[in-house]
Swiss-Prot record:
One of its GO terms (molecular function) is ATP binding. Its EC number is 2.5.1.75. Catalyzes the transfer of a dimethylallyl group onto the adenine at position 37 in tRNAs that read codons beginning with uridine, leading to the formation of N6-(dimethylallyl)adenosine (i(6)A). Its cofactor is Mg(2+). This is tRNA dimethylallyltransferase. The record marks T102, R125 as: Interaction with substrate tRNA. Keywords: ATP-binding, Magnesium, Nucleotide-binding, Transferase, tRNA processing. Signal peptide: none annotated. InterPro entries: Dimethylallyltransferase, IPT, P-loop_NTPase. NCBIfam families: miaA (TIGR00174). Monomer. It is an enzyme of class 2 (transferase).
Length: 312
C-alpha cells in the first residue's frame, strides 16, 4: 500500500460525516480524521454536529474532543500533529479518510494553502482577545484591514479565532510574507470527493438542521458551558450557533424564532463562502447527494475509492 488520502469535502451539513463513516466501514482498514475546529472542543457537541457515539465506537475518529473550552489549536499545530498521524497510519496500512469541515485547516494540511508559522505570544494574544470581547468582530476586521486587507477578506464571518491570530501576528511586527509556510505532506494521491445539492434543497436542509440543534438542547449546552466557566468569550463559544445562543441568553435576541433565523443566516453565509472556495478546486470529483439514495452514493464513491487504492 502506498500513501493514499481520501478527502470528503462539501459545505456544512451536506452529509460528509455520514458518508465518511459508511465509507470507512466498507474498507478493510480505515480511520477518519475530522478537520473541523468546532469538533475539537469537548464541551461543544450539539452545535458542531459531531459524529454520534455509534460512529466513533466503530471507526477510529481523530481530532474530536481534544480541547477544553479555553484552549486554542492553531493551524500550524494541527498541520504538524495531523501530518505525523497520517504517516503513522500509512505505515500501518490504514487508509485515512479526511473530512474537511474547516477548509483553511484542510488546505493547509494538504499543502495547497500557506499558513502562519509565527509562535503565539500569550501577552499579545490576550490583549487582542480583550479587544474582541470589548469591541466585537467588526472592530477586529477594521483593525486587520488597515494592516492586511487581503487576509481579512479570506477570513470567514464569525471566525474570531483566525481574526485574533491574524492581528496577533501583525502586532508582533511580522509581514504576511515573513509569517507563512506551506506544508509538504508526503502522499501519493489525494482523491477529493465533493458533496453538493441544489441551492433551495440545501437551504431547507440547513434550516432544518438548525431547528434540530435547538430542539436537541443547544441552548442548554451553552448554558452548561457558561455555568462552569462564566465566560461567553471562550474560543469554544466563538463559533456559529454558540455565539448566537450567548446573545439570546443576554437578551440581545428576542425569541427562539429569531435565534433560529440568526443561526441559519450565519450558517448560510459561511456555506456560501465554502461553496465559492470549493468551486475553485478543479480536482474535486463531485456527487449530487439529492440524486442518489445513501446506499447508491456509498456504492459509487466506494467504487471510485477502491479503483484509486488499487492504483496507488
Amino acid at each position: 500500500m502506498g500513501k493514499p488520502l481520501i478527502s470528503i469535502l462539501g459545505p456544512t451539513g451536506v452529509g460528509k460525516t455520514d458518508l465518511a463513516f459508511r465509507l470507512a466501514c466498507s474498507l478493510d482498514k480505515a480511520n477518519i480524521l475530522s478537520v473541523d475546529t468546532g469538533s475539537f472542543y469537548k464541551a461543544a457537541t450539539i452545535g458542531t454536529a459531531k459524529p454520534p457515539k455509534e460512529f466513533t465506537s466503530r471507526v477510529r475518529h481523530w481530532f474530536i474532543d481534544i480541547l477544553e473550552c479555553q484552549e486554542v489549536y492553531s493551524v500550524g499545530a494541527f498541520v504538524s500533529d495531523c501530518s505525523s498521524i497520517l504517516q503513522d497510519l500509512w505505515a500501518e496500512g490504514v487508509t485515512p479518510i479526511v473530512v474537511a469541515g474547516t477548509l483553511f485547516y484542510y488546505y493547509a494540511l494538504v499543502g495547497e494553502r500557506s499558513f502562519s508559522a509565527v509562535p503565539s505570544d500569550s501577552t499579545v494574544r490576550e490583549k487582542v482577545e480583550e479587544k474582541a470581547r470589548v469591541y466585537g468582530e467588526e472592530y477586529l476586521r477594521q483593525e486587520l484591514r488597515k494592516v492586511d486587507p487581503e487576509r481579512e477578506k479570506n477570513i470567514l464571518p464569525g471566525d474570531i479565532r483566525r481574526l485574533t491570530r491574524a492581528l496577533e501576528i501583525a502586532e508582533l511586527g511580522f509581514k504576511p510574507t515573513e509569517a507563512v509556510v506551506t506544508n509538504k505532506l508526503d502522499f501519493d494521491i489525494n482523491l477529493k470527493i465533493g458533496l453538493k445539492m441544489p441551492r433551495d434543497l440545501y437551504r431547507t436542509r440547513l434550516r432544518d438542521r438548525v431547528e434540530y440543534m435547538i430542539s436537541a438542547g443547544l441552548i442548554e449546552e451553552v448554558q452548561d458551558i457558561l455555568s462552569k466557566t462564566g465566560n461567553s468569550s471562550l474560543p469554544c463559544l466563538n463559533q456559529i450557533g454558540y455565539k448566537e445562543v450567548c446573545s439570546y441568553l443576554k437578551g440581545e435576541i428576542k425569541n427562539k424564532d429569531e435565534l433560529v433565523e440568526r443561526i441559519f443566516l450565519s450558517h448560510w453565509t459561511y456555506a456560501r463562502k465554502q461553496i465559492k472556495w470549493l468551486k475553485k478546486d478543479k480536482t474535486i470529483v463531485w456527487f449530487d447527494v439529492s440524486e442518489k439514495s445513501p446506499d447508491t452514493l456509498v456504492e459509487e464513491v466506494l467504487t471510485l475509492v477502491q479503483s484509486t487504492l488499487e492504483n496507488c
